[in-house]
Swiss-Prot record:
Gene3D superfamilies attached to this UniProt entry: Integrin alpha, N-terminal (2.130.10.130)
UniProt protein name: Phosphatidylinositol-glycan-specific phospholipase D
Gene expressing this chain: GPLD1
EC assignment: 3.1.4.50
Entry comment on modification after translation: Glycosylated.
Keyword Thylakoid: no
Catalyzed reactions: a 6-(alpha-D-glucosaminyl)-1-(1,2-diacyl-sn-glycero-3-phospho)-1D-myo-inositol + H2O = 6-(alpha-D-glucosaminyl)-1D-myo-inositol + a 1,2-diacyl-sn-glycero-3-phosphate + H(+)
Principal location: secreted
Organism listed in the record: Bos taurus (Bovine)
Ranges: FG-GAP repeats: 365-427, 434-496, 498-558, 562-622, 632-692, 703-769, 787-839
């Protein structure tokens, strides 16, 4: 009971330490610094900066959070708020470089190495904050989060994002790399501030005490903050879904910009700042003749805390040790054994209560094989497609890993080719870097090559070609224009080693190549290349575009195209509508029906200008159906639930509905709330997720036949959809993923995400609420209705983040991506291979 009281007290304490308007972000900044260091390659003369930072993690981690230390009112009654503000901007970095060069010439002693490591942590914080808060730039993380989830209210999105980012970090990541000691170079900081201000502006006591408060806050976050996941998941689906991957201010992007500022800082430490352009905003610093014409503007961060820490200080004690130039903070352990034991015991009890000690026969928990990578953060399986690439009559697998990095080359991305045979894909575990049949690699810094893939005969020479999306090309220039590369195939079954066709976009933030599709758009029976760019301006902000290039024999082996010259194009209706987030093509009466999802679309047509913001439903979502080359949509399907995001996923096929073979379209609304009943009690499952099934006919708009729903809060049931005939009966099975599903019903208070994928037999589909007609006393019941339930072999792996099937001689194999798996390396991703049914 005492442990429970302490946990409750910690949650209350964090509410005081990080109230509304607080900067916070301690866990987030430490995670960014950790990722930036992973692939840093920075040797300057005799100094290997990666080794230096690894040696002095105590200083590096403390520095990555230090700029926010004087914001809280609990810190000396807030009188040094402006000192924190100044620590976020270029003049502080300039003063630090001058101070180090003047006082500590090479070779550096250990204290100076720690000072440099601390400074590198500060610079990571600087550039991360610019992108996260949209300081002097547009469409950074929090600005977009405000537009999507908070009726465009940045003041509401700001505290939810700052503190919510820490909640999400602690819920999703393991901080086993966290140093038990932090070092703050207090004496040197006094000197740097004197250099910056020309006078004494802060005391050593304030530096030590306020930094120590951050150390305490980190301790509190490690113990309890993850238990607030349900609260912040409800506040912002965007935060949960885009926290790592969002192109401008997501974790991956902030880590990329951290490595950039590290190179600039090392240059200045060696050469001084005379050959550098030093605008106020650190994101736009250039050195050595580089040019950057966009300097942005300085925008104040701001933030306040309330005054409560006594309970926490009493519990962990004050472990502070002074040295000649600095101070060490230490903790015996970042977790309390009693709390850890309590969490695990409760998790086991709840798990047994809800799922029992044995699994139903329909549950499949072990894949036939797993394909992995040995490098972290690769996002293996982010995009997948299947086709007979080598023309041997068997299905092959194409899989993207857009987060793939080398030392010094972060997020260049890769695409892997795995060939099948008469038995299907290899049914042994594979390290794809060593055993894939083919590898293509991106060549642009942080271009995220492999974010989308499609196979088609683009040059109409009779052999398949491969199109690859790299939507973050241009990131180093802050343009994020993106690119699509087409690699021609050959009659020998090999792909070109370099792209034959490059398609570019001129618009800033175009993110060209976010989604790709092969579909016959012009009616010549040859698949064409369809490109979705949901973040593209489209004449506004993130309206999104869908563009098609017709296949033809006129393309040369070194073709340069621009998306503005596409053969067919449509644009989103509203700002932040994200048209093209999902794409799907289906043949209806010998015509291609092209479907485009716009999951963050909202209906503003019936509201006057003055009342649009607060009265509109956020992100009900919409799907557009086109019969190209006509650009006017033939039909639209609109969501009716706020935050439902209808159109996030799309798929089609043929199933038996009440005994009649029917062509159907499935549309996912993975963040739609679901009504659940437990006996006579009714509750709302926030973001449980729903999937609609429509009948497709040649002469009329799609008509709703059935719905499927998830049975856990936040599970995002329907986030990924796929239809494929798994048993050769001429009917497609319906495959529905719930990648964020949590086994227990507390939705994050106990346990982790474990993800599930449901396979519904195509012969047994009924009209109406399929998962609501249950034998048990709990509804919905997707597990009761599914023929198979694939269980994640690893907690927290986002099992079901992508799904595809590959045809072998006898039956299809099901490939499930777990994009956050750490099977091969931390958060690298994995592919699980399943062969369902009796062999």
């Amino acid at each position: 009971m005492s442990a429970f009281r302490f946990w409750s007290g910690l949650l209350m304490l964090l509410g005081f330490l990080c109230p509304r308007s607080s900067p916070c972000g301690i866990s987030t900044h430490i995670e960014i610094g950790h990722r930036a260091l992973e692939f840093l390659h920075l040797q300057d003369g005799s100094i290997n900066y990666k080794e230096l930072l690894l040696r002095h993690q105590d200083a590096y981690q403390a520095g990555s959070v230090f700029p926010d230390s004087f914001y809280p009112s609990i810190c000396e009654r807030g009188q040094f708020h402006d000192v924190s503000e100044s620590t976020h901007w270029t003049p502080f970095l300039n003063a630090s470089v001058h101070y180090i060069r003047k006082n500590y010439p090479l070779p550096w002693d250990e204290d100076t190495e720690k000072l440099v490591a601390f400074l590198f942590g500060i610079t990571s914080h600087m550039v991360a904050d610019v992108n996260w808060h949209s300081l002097g730039i547009e469409q950074g993380f929090l600005r977009t989060m405000a537009a999507i989830d908070f009726h465009n209210s940045y003041p509401e999105a700001h505290p939810a994002g700052d503190f919510g980012g820490d909640v999400l970090s602690q819920f999703e990541f393991k901080f086993n790399y966290l140093s038990r000691h932090w070092y703050v170079p207090a004496e040197d900081l006094l000197g740097i501030y004197r250099e910056l201000y020309g006078r004494i502006v802060i005391t050593k006591k304030a530096i030590v005490d306020c930094s120590y408060l951050q150390f305490l806050e980190m301790y509190a976050e490690m113990l309890a903050i993850s238990k607030l996941y349900p609260t912040y998941s409800v506040k912002s689906p965007f935060l949960v879904e885009q926290f790592q991957e969002y192109f401008l201010g997501g974790l991956e992007d902030m880590a990329f910009w951290s490595t950039n500022i590290y190179h600039l800082t090392s240059y200045m430490l060696k050469n001084g700042t005379s050959n550098c352009n030093l605008p106020e905003n650190p994101l736009f610093i250039t050195c050595g003749g580089q040019q950057n014409n966009t300097h942005g503007s300085k925008v104040q961060k701001n933030g306040f805390h309330k005054n409560v820490t006594a309970a926490l200080t009493k519990n962990i004690g004050k472990h502070i040790n002074y040295t000649k130039r600095g101070v060490f903070f230490s903790v015996d352990s970042w977790t309390m054994d009693s709390l850890s034991f309590m969490y695990k015991s409760l998790e086991r009890s709840i798990r047994e209560m809800f799922i029992g000690s044995s699994q139903p026969l329909t549950h499949v928990s072990s894949p036939a094989a797993s394909y992995y990578l040995s490098f972290p953060y690769t996002r293996l399986g982010w995009a997948m497609t299947s086709a007979d690439l080598n023309q041997d009559g068997y299905g092959d697998l194409v899989v993207g890993a857009p987060g793939y990095s080398h030392p010094g080359r972060i997020h260049v991305g890769r695409v892997y080719l795995i060939y099948g045979n008469d038995l299907g894909l290899p049914r042994i575990d594979l390290d794809l870097d060593k055993e894939a049949h083919g590898i293509l690699e991106g060549f642009q810094p942080s271009g995220r090559f492999g974010s989308a893939v499609a196979v088609l005969d683009f040059n109409v020479d009779g052999v398949p070609d491969l199109a690859v999306g790299a939507p973050s090309v241009g990131s180093e220039k802050l343009t994020y224009t993106g690119a699509v590369y087409v690699y021609f195939g050959s009659k020998q079954g090999q792909l070109s080693s370099s792209p034959n066709v490059t398609i570019s976009c001129q618009d800033t933030y175009c993110n060209l190549g976010w989604t790709l599709l092969a579909a016959d758009v012009n009616g010549d029976s040859e698949p064409d290349l369809v490109i979705g760019s949901p973040f593209a301006p489209g004449g506004g902000k993130q309206k999104g575009i869908v563009a098609a290039f017709y296949s033809g024999s006129s393309y040369s082996s070194r073709e340069k195209l621009n998306v503005e010259a596409a053969n067919w194009m449509v644009k989103g209706e509203e700002d932040f509508a994200w048209l093209g987030y999902s794409l799907h093509g289906v043949n209806v009466n010998n015509r291609t029906l092209l479907l485009a999802g716009s999951p963050t679309w909202k209906d503003t047509s019936s509201q006057g200008h003055l009342f649009r913001t607060r009265d509109e439903k956020q992100s009900p979502g919409r799907v557009y159906g086109y019969f190209p080359p006509i650009c006017q949509s033939w039909f639209t399907i609109s969501g009716d639930k706020a935050m439902g995001k209808l159109g996030t996923s799309l798929s089609s096929g043929h199933v038996m509905v009440n005994g009649t073979r029917t062509q159907v379209l499935l549309v996912g609304a993975p963040t739609q709330d679901v009504v659940s009943k437990v006996s006579f009690l009714t509750m709302t499952l926030h973001q449980g997720g729903s999937t609609r099934m429509y009948e497709l006919t040649p002469d009329s708009q799609p008509s709703l036949l059935s719905t499927f729903s998830g049975n856990r809060r936040f599970s995002r049931f329907g986030g990924v959809l796929h239809l494929s005939d798994l048993d050769n009966d001429g009917l497609d099975e319906i495959i529905v993923a719930a990648p964020l599903r949590i086994t227990d019903a507390t939705a994050g208070l106990m346990g982790e995400e474990d993800g599930r994928v449901y396979v519904f037999n195509g012969k047994q589909i009924t009209v109406g609420d399929v998962t609501g007609k249950c034998k048990s006393w709990v509804t919905p019941c997707p597990e009761e209705k599914a023929q198979y339930v694939l269980i994640s072999p690893e907690a927290g792996s986002r099992f079901g983040s992508s799904v595809i099937t590959v045809r072998s001689k006898e039956k299809n194999q099901v490939i499930i991506a777990a994009g956050r798996s750490s099977l091969g390396a931390r958060l690298s991703g994995v592919l699980h291979i399943y062969r369902l049914g009796q062999d």
